């Protein structure tokens, strides 16, 4: 027999709901700047910049110190632990710079994947041990939301029922712990684009994954109005020979979400999944314009698809500050427009914005 557990007070629920709504108000999205040291190193290597703490700090300072108008397009920023405690060149904490712009500060909380025994090289996510204590400390340090990424892949045998259930339950436990500590949980069940599967198969798998996630969230008494969902857009595998239009991607994506995601969820903040900057924007715009019911706000939580052009413009040189910040602002504004179905592709995008950002078995 089911029993009610008053896990959250009305005041806690109100705070969580208000934070979630503030992040995605008026087409705003999220900058995912939570890359680990290793992942950031891979990106710096591509522009021939050494992976040092100072170089990582310098690039992120360029992103966070843009004009205050960025707050019209970006409502939240996800930070890595290192970045949360870093300062700009004047000695001001990055998190305080963001807050002064009216941007909500978030933190990456998962600690990467671990092999899931009894499966074909599938994984579960680490980080639940000590999570409550970490959340409590982050809340004291000015953080208002968290992110937890679970990864599933498509192949002949994957994802297995075991992997789906294990990752769904880990996401739900994380979400419950976050809310107990005043953090809005971003729930991120990512189905990787690796493989040669078609769009229809991706939709089938994604519906199974999302249904399991929301069953688990319900089992763990998670307050849906105080959460955000960060799913992949539904696309064919990177090696699939058949190509699909943004409108086809949009129809499959919204259909799957409509079948599985409760209307109580405030917003769906899509990840870019290795698409080029321009494709991520075009697909988001098409999803908004899809002629199907959408009870949730549509938004974005992009990392590579907001930073690729900026990183290329920077090249590790302080003299490129203006070009770097302009490139970042351009993508932020474009995605804010797309989240409201107002983006118009002009065909004038730079080379960096049209380059695929796909990385096999991508990890943060």
Curated annotation (Swiss-Prot):
It is an enzyme of class 4 (lyase). The keyword rRNA processing does not apply. InterPro entries: Aldolase_I_AS (IPR029768), Aldolase_TIM (IPR013785), FBA_I (IPR000741). Pathway: Carbohydrate degradation; glycolysis; D-glyceraldehyde 3-phosphate and glycerone phosphate from D-glucose: step 4/4; Carbohydrate biosynthesis; gluconeogenesis; Carbohydrate metabolism; fructose metabolism. GO terms for molecular function: ATPase binding; cytoskeletal protein binding; fructose binding; fructose-1-phosphate aldolase activity; fructose-bisphosphate aldolase activity; identical protein binding; molecular adaptor activity; phosphatidylcholine binding. The active site is at 188 (proton acceptor), 230 (schiff-base intermediate with dihydroxyacetone-p). PANTHER family: FRUCTOSE-BISPHOSPHATE ALDOLASE. Catalyzes the aldol cleavage of fructose 1,6-biphosphate to form two triosephosphates dihydroxyacetone phosphate and D-glyceraldehyde 3-phosphate in glycolysis as well as the reverse stereospecific aldol addition reaction in gluconeogenesis. In fructolysis, metabolizes fructose 1-phosphate derived from the phosphorylation of dietary fructose by fructokinase into dihydroxyacetone phosphate and D-glyceraldehyde. This is Fructose-bisphosphate aldolase B.
